[in-house]
Amino acid sequence: MVKPKIALIGGGQIGNSIAHLAAMRELGNVIMFDIKDGLAQGKCLDIAQAAPISNFDVQLCGSNDISCIAGADIVVVTAGIPRKPGMTREDLIEINARIMVTVAEGIKTHAPESIVIVLSNPLDAMVTLCQKITGFPTQRIMGMAGVLDSARFASFIAWELGVSVRDVNAMVLGGHGDAMVPIVRFANVNGIPALELLKNKYGDEDKARQVMAGLVERTQDAGGEVVHLLQTGSAFISPATSAIAMVEAVIHDQKRLLPVCAMLDGQFGISGYYVGVPCILGVGGVERIVEFELTEDEQALLDHSVGEVKKLVDSLPL
């Protein structure tokens, strides 16, 4: 049986972590491209030499020639500069847009049948640019943001309540920025609303809502919190793990319902923009966008978030 080919564009910390996770889970053979001489080759060689210890058997290969991605089933794009302290994701747009144009042209030429997952920031703008340059059907171009943002929200809820993160479900919609929209009423611990458990903990509804508001705010700034602590870069393990969840859903046709940055065509009252929404992911990519009724407050927050996305997208060289 021919193993799937997973192409990684960008050999930084996120790309390296994705390569390691993909190999450990034996999701397919991994090819990594980076423009820096020897970087992708060295990182793939390092991971490959761990195979006898970790007991995985896939091929890993690095290259400085983007034609190496030819025939890829999935392309994961992490190329671009990371955030530094004091920077927002939006501050990255000018330089990362130039990088994305080159990357997208390479994907269009060498992997025209692939499904593409973009992680480069500012995410919503970069996935839009990638789709415009490649011209791929929108269901084959998506961004990773909501999986990570939702995991962060779930983690903060679990830590606050003192429960296992395995039992917490949470969902974040909208753009991958400070205006992202954690959906509080959907946050639960094995079906019990998180707000109810906060009320039980504090014995006061107002206090519970105040604490939840703090968790929402921390979720919105979670990436910045990591950047501030690291000082020299941004998060890489959690974004890579989030990307792997999406890669696995596509490769194994899992039909997973995950929050994905997808192109909307009227859903949630939004058309023509990539926005984080619940999607069914399978072998066809974004196979279905799952729409549900928002409250007035939730819709207002989502509209505001989309407004921020529009500002970014409208500044792109399209």
Swiss-Prot record:
Gene3D superfamilies xref list: Lactate dehydrogenase/glycoside hydrolase, family 4, C-terminal, NAD(P)-binding Rossmann-like Domain
Organism: Syntrophotalea carbinolica (strain DSM 2380 / NBRC 103641 / GraBd1) (Pelobacter carbinolicus)
GO biological process, any: lactate metabolic process
Class of enzymatic activity (EC top level): oxidoreductase
EC number(s) on file: 1.1.1.37
NCBIfam families found in the cross-reference section: MalateDH_bact, PRK06223.1
Name of this protein: Malate dehydrogenase
InterPro entries: L-lactate/malate_DH (IPR001557), Lactate/malate_DH_C (IPR022383), Lactate/malate_DH_N (IPR001236), Lactate_DH/Glyco_Ohase_4_C (IPR015955), Malate_DH_type3 (IPR011275), NAD(P)-bd_dom_sf (IPR036291)
Family affiliation: Belongs to the LDH/MDH superfamily. MDH type 3 family.
Chain sites annotated for binding NAD(+): G10, G11, G12, Q13, I14, G15, D34, N96, L119, S120, N121
Catalytic activity: (S)-malate + NAD(+) = oxaloacetate + NADH + H(+)
Annotated residues for binding of substrate: R83, R89, N121, R152
Keyword Membrane attached: no
Residues of the active site: H176 (proton acceptor)
One Pfam family matching this protein: Ldh_1_N
Xref: SUPFAM superfamilies: LDH C-terminal domain-like, NAD(P)-binding Rossmann-fold domains
GO molecular function annotation: L-lactate dehydrogenase activity; L-malate dehydrogenase (NAD+) activity
Sorted UniProt keywords: NAD, Oxidoreductase, Tricarboxylic acid cycle
This protein's encoding gene: mdh
Role summary: Catalyzes the reversible oxidation of malate to oxaloacetate.
Domain of life: Bacteria
Keyword Oxidoreductase applies: yes
